């Protein structure tokens, strides 16, 4: 099994080396993308790239971006060609969330095992899967 690619992430506190962790939210079966950073030699949760808004309308490859550090996260998505930022927004409470149409093939390159699990939760995508 080959090593997962590492992506650079720049934010207000500096630069981080990030791996992505792909999954599915339990409620609503939406696309989950977590960000892992190495701490003391161990890859652990750094932040969530996405947020679960199960009552907002979205396609299976779309997700809403967590509001904390969203400007930096949107730049990260663009820099690493993870997907396309959409004009629609999601809402929950007083927060507004950017919506992104993620490139599932690109996500397969970054976390093949996570995408296998994601495709198991979405059998309608199985013929598109290359992992």
What is the predicted role of each segment?
Residues 1-39:
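OB-fold ssDNA-binding interfaces and closely related basic DNA-contact patches used
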Residues 115-131:
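Short, cationic low-complexity segments
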Residues 67-120:
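Short, compact, well-ordered microdomains
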Residues 34-82:
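Acidic, aromatic-enriched beta-alpha/helix-loop junctions
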